[in-house]
């Protein structure tokens, strides 16, 4: 088959001419391999670069059930682009998925990421993946694969999108599904590290209205750093707690805040009554509420308001759970109790 005729002065086109730099992709793989290597754990078969990533379920599980989760970082990325700050969003990506699967009692086993951009900036992408690897280390799971998609024209220069995928395992007999939660149980709240990765469309609107100096000091760090603080990963302290006492239910406080996430683990007929005075509203949320004129109800529906994970235990176990989690470095408060639902009310009420 003869190639099509072209104009005498025309030169042959390459993939790079079309906007895809294969060499940059190869350079990125070389840069991130050491980060991924630090996350290796028992069960990983092979390294990065194969068509599929292999993982052997640990033999300690007699009846393993796999638990999967996927998520992104949302419009927090827009703030990362504006600040040219890319070192925290990788941990956000991991946290969003591993905290979700943890809620059902699962130990995170492995993680995969998807990084999409219009033009690949190797240093930026490597910084993001380094954060992903750090998140995997914090949660004890292996970064065993991923995809970097350079797609000219799909994203503006300097912007990218992220997606993450986590898989964990839990013994079938130890799945946490909220079925044992009963009246009188206690709701514990574990402190968040900040806004985490939800509500940033409202955050950005507040910033647009208030026009603050993001480099200004805000309680010992810049306002930018406070806004971009990575999502806290609760895996190790909560897995340890599950070995010591009965955790009846957990809720990762993400989009929808406390009032929409806690009901996801409650049986019909039960309500979690939360006391908003039981824990301090962190200064960053006070700042957002003040500068945005955000009502209390909207704050509780959009933001975590200082509580990143809710844990439900029996009243008899509450003090022991608090002591154990505090010793593990968590800030914990008794934020509410479980009671029978009253006619016409929601499954989580804040009083």
UniProtKB/Swiss-Prot annotation:
Q: Which UniProt keywords apply?
A: ATP-binding, Cytoplasm, Ligase, Nucleotide-binding, Purine biosynthesis
Instruction: From the UniProt record, list the reaction(s) this protein catalyses.
Output: 2-formamido-N(1)-(5-O-phospho-beta-D-ribosyl)acetamidine + ATP = 5-amino-1-(5-phospho-beta-D-ribosyl)imidazole + ADP + phosphate + H(+)
Q: Name one GO cellular component term.
A: cytosol
The biological processes this protein is annotated with in GO are: 'de novo' IMP biosynthetic process; adenine biosynthetic process
GO MF annotations in UniProt: ATP binding; phosphoribosylamine-glycine ligase activity; phosphoribosylformylglycinamidine cyclo-ligase activity
Annotated compartments:
Cytoplasm
Q: Which Pfam families match?
A: AIRS, AIRS_C
Pathway field: Purine metabolism; IMP biosynthesis via de novo pathway; 5-amino-1-(5-phospho-D-ribosyl)imidazole from N(2)-formyl-N(1)-(5-phospho-D-ribosyl)glycinamide: step 2/2
Gene3D superfamilies referenced in this protein's UniProt entry, alphabetically? PurM-like C-terminal domain, PurM-like, N-terminal domain
Spell out the family assignment given in the record's similarity comment.
Belongs to the AIR synthase family.
E.C. no: 6.3.3.1
Q: What is the lineage of its organism?
A: Bacteria, Pseudomonadati, Pseudomonadota, Betaproteobacteria, Burkholderiales
Q: Write down the CDD domains for this protein, in alphabetical order.
A: PurM
Highest taxon of source: Bacteria
Q: What is this protein called?
A: Phosphoribosylformylglycinamidine cyclo-ligase
